[in-house]
Amino acid sequence: MALSQMMQQYLEVKDKYKDALIFYRLGDFYEMFFDDAVTASKELDLTLTGRDCGLSERAPMCGVPYHAVDTYIAKLLAKGYKVVICEQMTKPGDQKGLVVRKVVREVTPGTRIDSVMLDGDKNNYLMSAYLSDDGKAGVSWTDISTGEFQNLLIDSQLNLKLNEILSRVSPAEIICNSKMKVRSNQLSLVRYGGIYKFSQYSDDAFSYDNAFEKVKAVLKNFSMFDGKPECVCSAGALLDYIEKTQKRTLKHIKSGEFDDAEQYMTIDANARRTLELMSSSGGKTSGSLIKIIDNTSTSMGARMLKKWLEKPSLDIGEINRRLDAV
């Protein structure tokens, strides 16, 4: 027995996105099949059914209504899954043969934009980390919902500073080159905390020539990367990943900044936990410092206050400006 044409089409998509759950549009539903269906039914508490697929056994299947899809995707992202949206491009009956379908978006923990999937009071960062042959690292991170794009060069105390930036930025997703993937296993927040996972991305995207072309095409102030090739590599790969997952260039990401570590107090991961800045000892927001002092009126204000707590300024002038604003 042979697979049906529709199921062949589905498996062609799945073959290109092996590490993601495929949401495959069928009429008013997004359906999942085979292993994806088993996983989604468990994680989303959906009924697992079956569908004739041309084989001797029915293909495991489950689905969600298209109008509520963002809610289900948000639940999967919160558990670390990636989701690929495969949309119908033609209507049944409009033409002979199989309905044309196309992947229109990849949604990952660090690339969510829709308000349903986001907590407006906190940033949702996607991070890129590159390790060079001589042990220097470029780290770039962005919140694609706001356009913020930060960069940092690490040329000493690599493990210590990587742990610090992870605990401060708290990225939802991290991509890296192959060398950084190996090195990440030495980080305490990876080995013992189990909090962060580095996902290896294409080394070609991290190559200097490819990364520089991407940075030059997107960031207006690309000259700020002069003398910092490691950051060119991390920033270029980050922009490449965004374009790949979103299937477009995000025009509101126009310029970048460098994270100036000399202007703020460095707080390591252990100190952050002890001080209970963002969460209490039980891992909950209630009882934390941010929960007690956050009386902001807007999501933008809440995000700003959170940054101020995570990066206490050492600049007297800046500290006084913040106090005067209260």
Regions found by a protein language model. Give the residues of each.
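Charged catalytic and DNA/RNA-contacting regions of genome-maintenance
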Residues: 1-326
